[in-house]
Structure formats: C-alpha cells, structure tokens
C-alpha cells in the first residue's frame, strides 16, 4: 500500500498528495456532547438528516405505510428510513416501461439484507433461510460482497412474515443498510482456525457494540409493544444519537496473508498481527477506505484505507467505537456525496484524526506492525485447518444461490447438505460459500452431494477471481448490466487469455452497473463500471491484493469493444511480464496506464499512456 506522510508547515499540517500538490487540511470541529452536536448541525443539513431527527429513532411512518394495501410501495421518506431496517424498496425495471404504458404502478418489491457478522450460519439457520427464499423470494438467495445474504423480490404484504421468519432463525436485518455501522466482515481463511475464531469473535463484538439500540425494528416487524407516540423520553441512542452517522460505515477484520475481505476498501478495518504460531497478538487499525464516487464529479473518488496504528486485543472495541464516533462528529452532514469517512480524513488529515481517536480511547496507538497480503481471492476445494477439520469452498457465480436449469442446483444442493452437515456455513467476501468444519469422516458424504447437484468447486482462474453487483433489473441506481452481463464477457475473455497462454493466470475482474462500487471494481485489476446501456468505463492497474486503486483506461467502452481493448494488453502481458508479476502491476510498469497513489489523484492522468 502507498503510504502518505503528512508534513508540518508553519500554518499547520499539510500533505503532499500526488497529482494535486501540497494542500492544507481544515481545522477539525470542536468536540461537543452529542445532543449539542445535533443542535449545532440544525442549519444546512441534508434532507436525510432531518428525516432521521424527526423519525422517532427510525420509526417514521413505516408502521402506517405497511397498512396501505392499495399500493405496493411506501413513501419516499420511509424508503430512506427502511434502509436502517435492512431493506431497499425496488421495482422491476425490465417491465417498468410496459407498466407505465398501461398506467399501472411500478412492480414494487423489496430487497432484504441480513446482518450476519462474519458471515457464519448454522445448518439449522441455513434451512430456515432456504425456506424463506422458496416461500417469499423467488426461490433464490444471494450471497453478497459483504458476507451476508440478500433476498430480492419480497412484496410489501410479505415483509412482516419474512422478518418473523428471519427472527425465528435468531437473525435480523437491523443496520444491514443505512447511515450506521453495517454488517461486519471477518476473515474466512479455513487453514487458520485459531485466528479465524478470534477474528470472527471481534467482528461479532464490534457488530453488537455498534448496533443501534432503538426498539423500532422489533416493534414494526415483529409486532412488539409500540411506544405511544413513537419514542418515549427515556429512549436514547447512546452511541449514535438521533442523527446516527452522516453516511454508511463499513467495518472488516482481516487475517494475513489473505485479504479476501478487501480491508483497504472499507471505512474501518482490523488486520490481525500474528506470531510464529499464528496467534493474534494485536491489530493494525485501518481507516478511510471506500469505493463509491459519482461520474463526472472529481471531488468524489474511491480511496484505499490508511493504517492508523496498532492496538492491543483489549483495546480493539474501544478503537472501533472511537473511530466511528469521530466520524459521527466530524463527518459532512450537508453533502451526502462527501459524507463518508474517506472524505473526513481528506479534509482534516490523518494526524488530526489519529489524535482525536487516541483522545477518545484514552491512550496512544502503537506504531503499525509489519504485515503482508498475497491476494484477495478465495481458496477453492478442500482445505484442512489447523484443528483437523475440513472446509470445502464452492464457487457460486455472483453469489446467486438458486437452481439453474441445465446447470448447478445450488439451492437444492445446499439444502440437502444442510440437512446432513455437522459443522457450519461461511460466506466469503467474494460471494462464495464454504461448507466449513466438516469432520474427516463426513467428507465423502459431502462430496457425493456436491457431485449429485453439480455444485462447482472451482472454475477458470478468471471466473474464480470475478465479482459482479446485481444491477439491472432490480437496482434503481444501475446504469448498465452487471451480473447478467459478466458471464458472457468472461467467456469472451477466457478465449482471449487461452490464446495467449494465460488461462491459468489469476487476474481479478469486477463489474458494477454504476460508480457506487458495490463489487469493489476500483481495487480490481480489471474493473468495469456502468455508464449507460452496454457502455462502461474500463479501469486497470489495481493491485492483486487489493491495496492499490486502479486508473481509468478507456471511457465509454461498449460491451462489444471490451475484448478487443483488452486482448493486446493480454498479448503484451504474456510476452513481457516478469516472473510472478501480476497483470495490474504489469500494465503500470509497462507504461500502459498511470499508477494511482490514492483517492485524490484517482482522476489524474487518466487514459492510455501508450498504445498496446
């Protein structure tokens, strides 16, 4: 990762940021008690801030809106609040024009996202989630890029039934979306059982500590006793306050040498520092990563996280709360496009941010400890852990767990496995599923079911390192296809790679339908970001381990032009690469594309530097 070292000037801290020259940071705000801070932010707030303040701790008009059976929708304002409850209101864009022509309401439905810290569920929970999918969500589950499940296509009249079923699995959807700390990811490396256990526990502890305390979720969705008038005088959010956070906040826990959680793409991260016996001795804390941006607005950009410092195990939770509450108090509540933690750090500087975090923890952070990542992909097939348990990673294209006509029967097959499995299931940040903690004596039974249902233990090197967001037809932000388009593109590129003898070369490729970056395309060696129907920006040059951003190589490339654009680069890579050199590193060294040091210079020196 590229380090940024602030320098002192007579007028205060400044940073030499590649591409934009030296600049001065803003002076951080004076810390206020949260109630005073809310009052101080009363002027000039973004609309969402007023919504949160007036919502009665996230109740709004949701309960009443569910009773309006004449429409499949809820109000626009409640559509913002319902995100905090773990769902988005969507419609089927494939039939939107047809329904408009017939003067019909849009085909509204809801995407529901679960909160599953670390992505681990039991076989019993899996079977309940499977039943929800077949009953309410079109017989499909989707493993997300952040280690949880999503249901698509749940209609309004089935929302409460779905939530009750989720609750019966001892799971929930609280804070899976919205301006809060969202689902906390954790390393899934099956070979490091001891470290994984500690990482998973930290993820769960952070999730519980930073969880909103409002009773609104249980009241609205499970018919819990409703407080008269919404909230009562005694109800508080001790960490968040009425305005919660300025924007989404994402936390991950990584265990080197694998970076499958993409730690540098998140607001807050903890990197396990291991001794020679793979025991966790503490955590490096990372801050300020994030993928989203807006096309054509150079003051928005993706950013890789900085390493803030080192904490002992007993201080990790304090550090998590301190980082989040500094963002709560310093983040931009007037412009949501610049509200993420990455912009807060760019405004005030890493040194000032670190000082405030240390103040809230009550002690200095240690110097960062050395660590090494070797990639951000999964390990497919069987892996034996330190404890003698066995783990089978299955490749699930775009995380879509459903039965495919003439192909793998993911939903049915994993249901059968859950009926006999004695361990647990783990979701990965790459949208795959691990059948975990299998006793040696059960491997043959699991293998037989995997074969019977055609489940995939792997695929080509390119497919194994690919990801796509949902995009069309359900995502309201999508500008282009992603999940439905990527398989065809991969087939084209596989042919090209094979022609150049690169069929076994791991290259990360990710696609998103818009620049919000849900599949983290800006830290993928090849990134496709939707611009319009069948048009994409093509990004190249990210690091294979996810530690360096890519650079815009070609604008508005049509779907039919992508293979032809990449083929000469593959040819050059096959001919001129150095031993062990990854594709993202090669295109920079060979002079095809400029290197991005970090977010502020992401939009500088774009385009091809020379012909391929």
Curated annotation (Swiss-Prot):
One GO BP annotation of this record: hydrogen sulfide biosynthetic process
Pathway: Sulfur metabolism; hydrogen sulfide biosynthesis; hydrogen sulfide from sulfite (NADPH route): step 1/1
EC class (word): oxidoreductase
GO CC, any one term: sulfite reductase complex (NADPH)
Gene Ontology MF terms in the entry: 4 iron, 4 sulfur cluster binding; heme binding; metal ion binding; NADP binding; sulfite reductase (ferredoxin) activity; sulfite reductase (NADPH) activity
Keyword annotations from UniProtKB, A to Z: 4Fe-4S, Amino-acid biosynthesis, Cysteine biosynthesis, Heme, Iron, Iron-sulfur, Metal-binding, NADP, Oxidoreductase
EC number(s) stated in the UniProt entry for this protein: 1.8.1.2
SUPFAM superfamilies: Nitrite and sulphite reductase 4Fe-4S domain-like, Nitrite/Sulfite reductase N-terminal domain-like
Superkingdom assignment: Bacteria
Family: Belongs to the nitrite and sulfite reductase 4Fe-4S domain family.
PANTHER family: SULFITE REDUCTASE [NADPH] SUBUNIT BETA, SULFITE REDUCTASE [NADPH] SUBUNIT BETA-RELATED
Name this protein carries in UniProt: Sulfite reductase [NADPH] hemoprotein beta-component
Organism this protein belongs to: Methylorubrum extorquens (strain ATCC 14718 / DSM 1338 / JCM 2805 / NCIMB 9133 / AM1) (Methylobacterium extorquens)
Gene that this sequence comes from: cysI
